[in-house]
Amino acid sequence: MKKHNYSAGPCILPQEVFEKSAQAILDFNHSGLSLLEISHRSKDFVAVMEEARALVLELLGLKGKGYQALFLAGGASLEFLMVPYNLMKENGKAAYLDTGTWASGAIKEAKHFGETVVIASSKEENYNHIPKNYSIPSDANYFHCTSNNTIFGTQMKSFPEVNIPVVCDMSSDIFSRVLDFSKFDLIYAGAQKNMGPAGTTLVIVKEEILGKTGRYIPSMLDYEKHIKAESMYNTPPVFPIYASLLTLQWLKNLGGISAIEKINNAKANLLYSEIDRNTLFKGTANAEDRSNMNATFLLNNKNHTELFDKMWAAAGISGLSGHRSVGGYRASMYNALPLESVQVLVNVMKELENKI
């Protein structure tokens, strides 16, 4: 049976990425060697790294605009530390918008480096919305936000325009929608949502904002060191980067971000329309802030849980259970999830309605 993978991450990837990755593991570029055993300094992998970095900037519309794309290790969680290390000045200040678990994790790390101003938070409402009315201090070294919140199913639809560097954690919605990415000075994202398997982290940074903290930065945490080493300061995670390149190529061939945005909108509209129509269900996020990537919803009557769980599992749906802090269900609709998989879930929801 075909599986419909709604996992929040690591998540579904395009079928062609699996097929090409499998071949590369057996014989990479007809070299007679596995991708898993080649030197990261070989011309074949250097070409992979160069193409991947260039394709990131091309897809985001940042080519030739003073940005560098890096493939690092440590996940987005390490970026919680690296961002203030590289951007918050000695005795400096940073402004953070608290919209969920990952934003609060970033705030926790930033507090070790200087004054960390939480300009707004939706924590008291269990992060069911994105705060709208807030003021960003003009003397902050940077402003940090999280564009999409996988656990609580909210997503920022607009971003403030300020005269300080803007940093954004886009781990769960990068490459999913059209934005003016030049409004951001630093973007970071764990690969395992819309780009590839777990194991590498993408950082896109405008070079001109670096080197201004006045502090010593350990080499492995220094963006400038990684830029100078062309993202190979140490041995990079070869396989995740190669798989990420394949996903980026797939996205480009599909028509780029504008093309995938239309598909993602169609998927989200289909599911949210059913959640709103079907009286057995209710969404957990405020309607205006609903995420196109992660739809969170509950059954109005928990007595129907066992039946619904059996029905969606029997339909080949996987990974639909919600995070423990929210409960209910979470349908993660990342780029590679086809519209037909969302239709299968909607059909199950309608079938439950007919049975009750």
UniProtKB/Swiss-Prot annotation:
Residues reported in the UniProt entry to bind pyridoxal 5'-phosphate: A76, S77, W102, T150, D169, Q192, N234, T235
Record's subcellular location: Cytoplasm
One short Pfam name that applies is Aminotran_5
Keyword terms, alphabetized: Amino-acid biosynthesis, Aminotransferase, Cytoplasm, Pyridoxal phosphate, Pyridoxine biosynthesis, Serine biosynthesis, Transferase
EC number assigned by the record = 2.6.1.52
Q: Name one GO biological process term.
A: L-serine biosynthetic process
- Amino-acid biosynthesis as a keyword? yes
MF terms in GO? O-phospho-L-serine:2-oxoglutarate aminotransferase activity; pyridoxal phosphate binding
- GO CC terms in record: cytoplasm
What PROSITE patterns does the record tag this protein with?
AA_TRANSFER_CLASS_5
Residues bound to L-glutamate: R41
**Catalysis: reaction(s):** O-phospho-L-serine + 2-oxoglutarate = 3-phosphooxypyruvate + L-glutamate; 4-(phosphooxy)-L-threonine + 2-oxoglutarate = (R)-3-hydroxy-2-oxo-4-phosphooxybutanoate + L-glutamate
Keyword check for Amino-acid biosynthesis: yes
Residues carrying N6-(pyridoxal phosphate)lysine: K193
What cofactor is this protein dependent on? pyridoxal 5'-phosphate
CC cofactor note: Binds 1 pyridoxal phosphate per subunit.
* Pathway listed: Amino-acid biosynthesis; L-serine biosynthesis; L-serine from 3-phospho-D-glycerate: step 2/3; Cofactor biosynthesis; pyridoxine 5'-phosphate biosynthesis; pyridoxine 5'-phosphate from D-erythrose 4-phosphate: step 3/5
Q: How does it assemble?
A: Homodimer.
Q: Which family does it belong to?
A: Belongs to the class-V pyridoxal-phosphate-dependent aminotransferase family. SerC subfamily.
Q: Which HAMAP family match?
A: SerC_aminotrans_5
Function of the protein: Catalyzes the reversible conversion of 3-phosphohydroxypyruvate to phosphoserine and of 3-hydroxy-2-oxo-4-phosphonooxybutanoate to phosphohydroxythreonine.
User: What is the protein's given name?
Assistant: Phosphoserine aminotransferase
Q: List the taxonomic lineage.
A: Bacteria, Pseudomonadati, Bacteroidota, Flavobacteriia, Flavobacteriales
